[in-house]
Design a protein with these regions (language model features):
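A solvent-exposed interaction/effector surface
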Residues: 1-184
């Protein structure tokens, strides 16, 4: 009977390793796609309906975003790794004359969600390098949206596509900001 127990243990370990391998392969494909992204310009893109889980807490520093994403992923039944996951990010709202981070989210399956990112038009801006200019980019995007006869329809969404979990070189970080818009 010992050998049967050992076999079950090994089968479980193999499944875990296969899951980890699949996750890594998917992440490599995601990272490869970033080389085809357009940087430093606002553009309008169409996105499908996206289902999300979220954790709403005061976020006063970048390090707390990782902590909250990890906390959120642990509360989910799905086996996911959010650190370095292009399907996770933070919500940024305009409150009291400033942009503030109000929650973190993870895209998830349809039947397990807290809110929905509606399908439709999104103004996007993707850039590389440090995060210290992100706040001014919200204003830049807002101006671009108005100049191109669109109206903002929700909060800004910040996706950290490549960050400290993939590279130690700050110049290799990639951030994508999205905000839902509609024509005026």
């Amino acid at each position: 009977m010992f050998l049967k127990e050992e076999e079950k243990l090994i089968q479980r370990q193999i499944q875990e390793l296969q899951s980890t391998l699949f996750s890594i392969q998917t992440r490599i494909e995601d990272l490869d796609r970033t080389q085809y992204m357009e940087f430093g310009t606002c553009k309008i893109e169409v996105y499908p309906k996206r289902y999300c889980r979220y954790l709403k807490e005061k976020i006063d520093q970048d390090e707390k975003i990782d902590f909250l994403l990890t906390k959120l992923s642990e509360s989910m039944e799905e086996d996911i790794s959010v650190l370095g996951n292009m399907d996770s990010g933070s919500v940024v709202e305009y409150k009291n004359n400033e942009y503030v981070y109000t929650s973190v989210f993870i895209l998830t399956q349809e039947d397990k969600h807290d809110f929905i990112l509606d399908e439709g038009l999104y103004c996007t801006y993707t850039y590389s390098g440090q995060y210290d200019r992100t706040n001014q980019l919200f204003y830049k995007m807002k101006d671009w949206i108005q100049e191109h006869n669109y109206k903002i329809e929700g909060p800004f969404l910040e996706f950290l596509l490549i960050d400290i979990h993939e590279t130690k070189k700050v110049e290799e970080y990639i951030t994508s900001i999205h905000v839902k818009v509609k024509p005026r």
